[in-house]
Design a protein with these regions (language model features):
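Catalytic cores of peptidoglycan-degrading enzymes
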Residues: 160-287
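Surface-exposed, glycine-biased beta-strand/turn segments
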Residues: 26-27, 100-215
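Cationic-aromatic interfacial patches
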Residues: 19-105, 110
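Short, charged/polar, Gly/Pro-enriched secondary-structure boundary elements
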Residues: 82, 112-115, 276
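A short, sequence-level motif marking secondary-structure junctions
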Residues: 65-68, 107-111, 234-237, 281-284
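Bacterial N-terminal signal peptides
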Residues: 2-14
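Non-catalytic surface loops within mature trypsin-like serine protease
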Residues: 44-46, 77-79, 108-112, 173, ...
Length: 287
């Protein structure tokens, strides 16, 4: 794993009035800054039935890793998270149904993102009324998808880069289109010629395959437990909504549809509603 920081601690669990059992909790992250993914690992001397981590107003599910004594969770620090001290509340139950609770501190530091200035078709900066209605409808549809946290975990093992090209635009960049400030870049752009195969970074289920106003031909893959991959600006689809896909399966082709200045792949990751950098995910669970 490519983490740059790791925090470990012990807390006491006292189920059902029995003697306390030690639980080791470790947190790993490339950094504790906006857009980063934090890996939470729990080792218990007593088997647990369920566990979740609540922080930043979101509830992140944890899952047993190999057995009920080892649990893992992924926490997202959203792009707009302010610097400060936050508490991760761990809660769940053991196999006897007794509650398990604890908390741990995360200290989030500030991050400065660069700015990109682009000249694009005016219809993407000031959409006509008909397009505005379409944009609103599409935004609502995508929000409903990202709000769902499925109980099934499709993904397993390390994540893979979906295309071989280098990064050409980083996550979090502040965007200025035709001289007007717009929302920050919530994904990572990879260079690629039109027609380059786009592969699923991990297993999942296709929950959207449609043409959207801004991101053009778009695919969303539900990897489970609130994690989604969003691929934009494709030239073609190789899957349909409802399809279950395997890691490295071709799901589409690089294109230049929607709001673009040239062909590339836009890859966004959502984790229980938080906007995180795909490269942060790869640093923890990448290959």
């Amino acid at each position: 794993m490519g983490c740059l920081s790791c925090i470990s601690l012990l807390f006491m669990l006292a189920p059902g009035g029995a003697a306390g059992a030690d639980i080791k909790v470790s947190h790993q992250a490339r950094s504790l800054q906006p857009g980063e993914v934090v890996l939470v690992e729990v080792e218990s001397l007593q088997p647990l039935r369920q566990l979740r981590a609540t922080v930043f107003g979101h509830e992140f599910p944890c899952f047993a890793e190999g057995n009920d004594f080892k649990w893992t969770g992924l926490v997202g620090i959203d792009l707009d998270t302010k610097p400060g001290r936050y508490w991760i509340k761990l809660s769940g139950s053991d196999t006897n149904g007794q509650p398990v609770t604890s908390q741990d501190e995360l200290v989030v530091t500030a991050k400065t993102f660069p700015t990109r200035e682009l000249t694009v078709d005016e219809k993407f900066v000031n959409p006509p009324p008909a397009a505005q209605a379409r944009i609103k409808q599409e935004s609502a549809r995508v929000s409903v998808i990202f709000d769902k946290v499925s109980s099934q975990r499709y993904w397993r093992g390390p994540f893979h880069v979906p295309v071989p090209g280098p990064v050409i635009s980083e996550f979090g960049k502040r965007s200025i289109y035709n001289g007007q400030p717009r929302s920050p870049h919530t994904g990572t752009d990879f260079q690629g010629a039109i027609g380059t195969p786009v592969k699923a970074p991990n297993a999942g289920k296709v929950v959207l395959a449609a043409n959207l106003y801004y991101s053009g031909n778009t695919i969303i893959i539900d990897h489970g437990l609130g994690m989604y991959s969003y691929f934009g600006h494709l030239s073609a689809f190789s899957v349909h909504e409802g399809d279950e896909v395997l890691q490295d399966q071709i799901v589409g082709k690089v294109g230049a549809t929607g709001l673009v200045t040239g062909p590339h792949l836009h890859w966004s990751v959502r984790l229980v509603g938080t906007r995180v950098d795909p490269l942060s995910l790869l640093s923890l669970l990448g290959k």
